[in-house]
Amino acid sequence: MFPMVTEFMNYGQQTVRAARYIGQGFMITLSHANRLPVTIQYPYEKLITSERFRGRIHFEFDKCIACEVCVRVCPIDLPVVDWKLETDIRKKRLLNYSIDFGICIFCGNCVEYCPTNCLSMTEEYELSTYDRHELNYNQIALGRLPMSIMDDYTIRTIFNLPEIKT
């Protein structure tokens, strides 16, 4: 008879614990009911991305020393660096640099470990194309700065919440 009492007590404790977990989940659901909707009309309204947003990579050709650190730290060995050794000055001369954004996972390791800071992350996230080969950017395409959202008069930017003026 004693084991039956302990099983009944365990059943009661498990029931109370389950009810508490369901209640906690329900309270979280109810707390979200007070929030305002965050849906935006995307092509016409855009959110301002954070400073640490990992968008398209910007490349500065003049700063690059062709050390290939970016290739070594990339988990998928993505950046393609073509260089030529100048024997008279015993330095590498960069010929071509390209990144295929169809394969890139935007981890940011290349930007973080670059010794000359020739790579940086931009806020550009609209990289969609109809042909995947257009996502292979060479040094010229990587060197272009993205058009700022703030300067485009056709797009209304959404900050946090609209302020009510009294």
From Swiss-Prot:
SS bond list: none
GO cellular component entries: chloroplast thylakoid membrane
Catalytic activity: a plastoquinone + NADH + (n+1) H(+)(in) = a plastoquinol + NAD(+) + n H(+)(out); a plastoquinone + NADPH + (n+1) H(+)(in) = a plastoquinol + NADP(+) + n H(+)(out)
HAMAP family attached to this UniProt entry: NDH1_NuoI
PANTHER family: NAD(P)H-QUINONE OXIDOREDUCTASE SUBUNIT I, CHLOROPLASTIC
Xref: NCBIfam families: ndhI, NuoI, PRK05888.1-3
Assembly and binders: NDH is composed of at least 16 different subunits, 5 of which are encoded in the nucleus.
Role played: NDH shuttles electrons from NAD(P)H:plastoquinone, via FMN and iron-sulfur (Fe-S) centers, to quinones in the photosynthetic chain and possibly in a chloroplast respiratory chain. The immediate electron acceptor for the enzyme in this species is believed to be plastoquinone. Couples the redox reaction to proton translocation, and thus conserves the redox energy in a proton gradient.
Stated family: Belongs to the complex I 23 kDa subunit family.
Protein name: NAD(P)H-quinone oxidoreductase subunit I, chloroplastic
